[in-house]
Amino acid sequence: MSSRKSRMDRYSNLHDESYTDVNEFLEKNKKERNIKNKIPKSEIDFSELLESKEEKKVKKAKPNLDEFFESKEEKNLEEKTDNKKSSKDSKTKLNGIFNNSGDKMSNTFIADEEELKSILKDTKKKNKKMKLWQKILVLIICIGLILGSILGFLLYGPNPKFRNWLITTAMTTMNHQYLAKWFYSDKTIDEVLKKNYVKESGEDTDTSKVTFIDYSKTKVMYKNKYEKEILTKDKGNDLFKLININEGSMRGYLVAIYDPSKVKMETAASMGNKGEMLVSIAKRTNSAVAMNASGFIDPNYNSNGGRPYGVVIKDGKIVSNLERANVGGGVIGFTKDNKLILGKMSGDEAIKKGVRDAMEFGPYLIVNGKPSFIKGNGGWGTAPRSAIGQRQDGIVLFLVMDGRDYAHGVDGVGMVELTEILAKYGAYNASNLDGGTSSGLVINGELTNKPVNGSGEKMTRAIPDAWVVSK
């Protein structure tokens, strides 16, 4: 009440007294306040007052670290001099002075220097780990985006080459058709397959065009290097010659068999129940050369390999006659006069035509010297392949091409490449055989080629039968 009354008195004076200006009034009131508070005007320093308030705020916000380290150094010096405390005692008292409304307060903190260092070290390590983890994550995301973009462009881009290759390659396998169905609809797959196919000539082979020639009694004029490779026999081996195929990304083997009467059909020991490995067939039959032949029925994808597609004829008798594969072609066999015959006929019709050994597959690649018309990649993609052919001079050709070895750049071949290789070496009649993991070539009991299955594993599988060259 007293303060309120004094203010009222002061304001009442404003009306009682007369002032020349406002400054005179303010000056008088300042003098009155100074007198009442007994503080000389000259002693009031507002800058110091503001600084004092700022210092209080700082002291409230954090402890005085300078005083902490100074007191710590002094204490350590005293400990070394007096030698009264253990060196293991790393705890020191941290004294900080806090001011609150002009009052001084002192608080003591216990700090462990080693523990603080350890915490800081662990924090730095965690930060580094997080940064490294973040870098790895960013790198993975970037790589994923790049690969995804490339794959998307290949799968759905304007150039259909990769799409056609993937669909035709996958759809001609037994176990990996899902690779095409993952990315494309049935409609797209059908459209691609319709644009990639093999159109056979429709002719049956004219065996009269094949005439055996004994080159040992004839002067030879080589037409090209391929003919020279065929006709130049290995020293001491008049039965066959192994020729390496190494052109671009193509790797494989061609065998020239000089005596076609030695070419025969051999079946797995338990054909009808389970297949047999090619090496086993070759050794069991004492064959100098062996190559896979028929495809096989495999509804459960268990690679049993025991039931061949179509007809199988051995020594002039039908030993198997199951459903045909939807691969074109037809009967592939040798007549009793040792000529390769290709024709769309039944097993009985083949027997009537004098066929001694045969199997069934396709497509036919060359008939009577005329290559089949191949649209696109032929609808078979690229993979390991096997084929059989015969030249006009009677020499038989076994061709086995490796594939799926992408690490070494060996993709395999399609129908186009297979036909070209056979044509270069003079095939007059030729047909595709079962391929993929089944493709195999055994020379003198040893697997010569490098088969790879659809999963990239280096292995072959059991098959129902094989073309062999007896010793």
Predicted regions: what is each one?
Residues 296-378:
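Active-site-adjacent helix-turn-beta-strand microarchitecture at beta-sheet edges
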Residues 303-323, 372-429, 433, 438-471:
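Conserved, well-ordered active-site substructure
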Residues 269-274, 347-350, 401-406:
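Short, solvent-exposed aromatic-acidic interface loops
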Residues 289-293, 342, 367, 429-433:
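General beta-strand structural signal in soluble alpha/beta enzymes
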Residues 249-254, 328-329, 382-387, 464:
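Short glycine-rich loop/turn motifs
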Residues 261, 338-340, 394, 437:
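Structural signal for glycine-centered tight turns and loop->strand junctions in beta-sheet-rich domains
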Residues 1-122:
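N-terminal targeting leaders characterized by basic, low-complexity, disordered sequences
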Residues 3-7, 15, 22-25, 29, ...:
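Zymogen propeptides
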